[in-house]
Amino acid sequence: MVNYRFVAALFWLLMIATLSAATNGIGCLFSNGGIIRGPVTEKKIALVFTGHSFAEGGATILDELKRHHAHGSFFFTGDFLTNAAFAPLIRRVVSEGHYLGPHSDKHVLYADWDKPEKTLVTQKEFRRDLTANLKKISAFGVARSDVKYFLPPFEWFNADIVRWSADAGLTLVNFTPGTRSNADYMGDDDKNFVSSEKIFQSILTREQSDPHGLNGFLLLLHIGSGPARTDKFAARFGELLDALTAKGYEFVRVDELLEQRPPVFVRANQVGYGLQEPKVAVAFSHVALPESFSLVDAATLKTVFTGRGQAILNVTWGQFTNHAELDFSKVKRAGNYFIRCGDAVSWPFAIGENIYAPLPDALLEFMREQRCGYNPWLGTNCHPADGRTAYGPLTNGTPLDASGGWHDAGDLLKYLLTSGNATAQMLLAYKLNLHSTNFNDHTDALGNATTNGLPDILDEARWGLDWMLKLHPAPEQLYHQVADDRDHAGWRLPPDDPVDYGWGKGGARVVYFADGQPQGLRKYLSASTGVANLAGRYAAAMALAYQIWRDDPQRKEFAARCLQAGKEVYALGRAKPGVQQGNSCLSPYRYEETTWADDMEWGAAELFRATGEKQFLDDAKRFAALAADESWMGKEQTGHYQFYPFMNVGHFRLYDLVDDGFKKVLAGFYRSGIERCIAAGGKNPYRIGVPFIWCSANLTAALVTQCAMYERMTGDTRYREFAAAQRDWLLGRNPWGTTMFTEIGSVFPRDVHLMTTQLTKRSVRGALVDGPVYDRIFKSLKGVTIREPDPLAAFQGAAVYHDDMHDYSSNEPTMDGTASAILMFALEKTFPGTR
């Protein structure tokens, strides 16, 4: 029996060598009037998928396209479009911005196999078949004006079909021959079967042998091949995209490839929006943007709102000169939606109540992954020998139990500087939502997947508290750091840490005493001046723990112990005002905190709430005046963690303890910082008010939190839209179209600078990465590089972001940044709320 589709494929392979090719004004290659290749001037490929009876590869294909920030073109028959089992897949094709076009209604053969010039249907029959196909496409919300290209059934046509397609307002396209990709449908028992490996290698061979590589290719694959083929090419699709991406190719829709028009991009919050809050997306392009946009219901694909874009004037981003805000705040109906602006669509998102309620618990997964000691994510223990002392009252090298706590980021160091803040912020997140059901109990105290009757956020905070108590072994003693940058000795899992700090490979690690003096075991000394920064945050965490557990019969003794430790360490801070910075050893990079009055204010305010002792209230007011509005806000450059924490929680916690006059002063401090950020945000089209320094995402979370706290303090809603823009930046409304949290949203950081995920080939949910940095910072840092080509190159501007494991400046998750985002989202649950 003759396999006519295989004969057709061979025909095209032979024809490519002899066809009479014509080139139109934009450099396309034609055969018999149909386009078989786009312009070869750029490294762009149109990935073309056809479907009629099967679709088992569809989900994998769409997932891989999403992973590569790529778009494809899908040509489906009417029978495919009306198959209820395929409807979710088709809706996903549309909602994720891919091209959806016709492939005939019934998959009939239009031209004779042996004599292709012989047409097997009349023009009337062709038109009826095509019209039915187009009608079924429109049922998925695709406007007829957006359907411009037609790929014929069996990829077989003649001049009549080309002409009749044009009469129907469509341009006929077919695959570029020469790669054997179209053979991916053949069954295992077919005598002309081509394995997925051979197809894969054939594509790469053609890329090497063609003078233009695969530039302009229409690379055809089938969305499904049915049960007759077990060697599914979809399983190799991601590998193919990886290989071609590494060679510099971009994957675009067929209309973008052939029309050579600058694309439009739409960026929105990929998680979603509250019913009553501002809802503003951003569209951008190299050229003038469409005047209007529409909001489309992702379930029905019906337009529910149409609006006009508001041009953002006098600002640009990178190569993009045209930006517009797409405001759909009037939509207050719950559902799942996406935005369409011209040919572009956003990633889908939700509108509804409590949109952010699941996120704090999601972010806790990363906190558990960062645990030192017993790590539930790895299911094993690490660093049991932490540690041996340096500086302080004990002989250097004296054993001190500093096990537990959290690894700070992608490395394995542990800092009280960041951990104290993370612990306090998680406790405050719970305290502010004391009666909320949104904090769930999925794990036990060790982080294992079994309940223990305590919300997971308190389990995680308790993990931090237990470690902090170990760092305060006596009333006059406080330790602040375990390990140093000798840790940066190659990639390994925490239990396999081989670093030698002087007590043998993989042995005890150094534990630094907080003496308030410059420290550093080699040439790089810190600029420490005191311990008040550490002490204030320590006291805040311990006093919050007491407030939460003092009436809990099972934990009241622990609460009392925390309060006593908080008082003792607060006294150390009072006696030694100033900052204890992080210590480095081999390089100049360290935590360079210079502020401390804000921390003492917070600690004093929480101690007053815990004890009612007037001295603490007096101290809090004094430190509040000293801290004032000093922060990074409004600055273009600062030292690393110079103004830490990145917002002063102390003003918020003191606010309802003071008289009206002092309340105005505290609110004014917050307002001053926010206004400086608004001014900075006016210089970019996304209204982002933070400097793009190291950990800009942490700054952004802090800014959102300050706006939310200001509103809770005063009832003043003036900053709500500005705060929403900052939050939305973290959730996808940015040039790169990615959230800054792993596994949150449709597109998120995947190749993060984190040893545990890279070495285990697993992903972790909820990690906040550092976020974009100024291009000049990226280029100045030692040891920072990326793999080329950069898939996000088109979207880089004055600030750059790389989803690349080698870029620790923008794509390294931080434990404390993630904890601060937990507080941010906890406030969002009740935002807008009452005081």
Briefly describe each language-model feature range.
Residues D456-V482:
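Carboxylate/His-rich catalytic cores and anion/metal-binding grooves
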Residues T82-A85, H107-L220, G224-E259:
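Catalytic domains of cell-wall/extracellular-matrix polysaccharide-remodeling enzymes
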Residues A8-T18:
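Bacterial N-terminal signal peptides
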Residues P455, G516-V569, K576:
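A conserved hydrophobic secondary-structure block that centers on an alpha-helix together
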